[in-house]
Amino acid sequence: MNEIRAAALSDHLYNKAAFRRIPLSGTFELSPLCNFACRMCYVRKTPQEVRAHDRPMLQFGDWLRIAREGREQGLLFLLLTGGEPLLWPRFWELYGELVDMGMLVAINTNGSLIDDEAIARFRRRPPRRVNITLYGGSDGTYERLCGVRGVFSRVDRAIRGLKAAGISVKLNCSLTPDNAADLEAMVAYAKELGLQLDLAHYMFPPIRRDPSAIGVNERFTPAETARSRVRGIELQQGMDAARAFLERVKGGCAEPPGLEEGCYDPVDGRVRCRAGSASFWVTWDGFVTACGMMPQPRVELEGRPFADVWRELTEATAALRLSGVCARCENRLLCHPCAAMAAAETGSTEGVPQYLCHVAKALRRMADEI
């Protein structure tokens, strides 16, 4: 019941914040550096690439200033991400300052750097939640997808250690052809530990990392994405739930795949994106964007009060337009196209993301077979 009440309260706050253009939620992308080299990553850079970049990484004082000025504007929920945020040199110092500031801080991490000392630090200053991305169910899968050896056992120890310490943990999983064979094992693992596992079957083209990657990523074909979605529901909720999902598909309305929390309304399933109206994302090199999956709109942060930056971002976001084709499509409540998806798939928020069209059609075909 507490979780239900918390979710309802959070939704109420977000709705009010979006109406009043209050930056209730923010993401701090501390660094593009990561000890993994996942093939589908949208942001990762090597140290050499960071040094060659035309803008420096934000520093400790920069992040503190943004947090303090953001708090004055209504910032409460804060997500620390990367890259791998625990690699950032002053992570623990910044984390402590943010928690002491009254922020409700969550962390996105691959979990490989969470040892006993890290767990002890989290116990002293508990985060709102630690989100750990599970990339497979074995060391071999991690090596194939992430380019790292002997890591799954470390991640497993971290997850079990956090849970034993009473730290809130959620598992995320980005499904690709390289780890699809582990889906059943990952679902079983989450059930064994009694943890939520969110499956993302859709991989955004990494246009922030590589502007030429429009419509391209290490991902499933549309038909494979459709099958993966149904299989995930079957494994997590049972055959009856999978059949009910396909019945909703047949009716033309089903919950969207792989979107972040808060992207869609849990009542009617419609995408109600809060990016740029109640939430923001700060990139490692000092831009404020509406969403981390798209490079535009973005606002220069350096030397400007956060209040001015936020105002400019809300105006730029409100001016975004999606394709009228999508708005009229009979499958619009199956693929749920958003501005970030359209931009990543076509290069424009007004483009028609054909990949999603094909996923929706594949789901329709599956639904017609039941």
Regions found by a protein language model. Give the residues of each.
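Short glycine-enriched, charge-decorated loop/helix-capping segments at active-site entrances
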Residues: 51-57, 144-150, 344
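Conserved alpha-helical substructure of the radical SAM core
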Residues: 1-129, 232, 370
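Accessory C-terminal segments flanking Radical SAM cores
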Residues: 19, 27, 195, 211-214, ...
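Short, solvent-exposed turn/loop segments enriched in Gly/Ser/Thr/Pro and often Arg
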Residues: 83-84, 203, 342
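Residue-level signal for the nucleotide or nucleotide-sugar donor/cofactor binding architecture
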Residues: 58, 89, 150, 178-181, ...
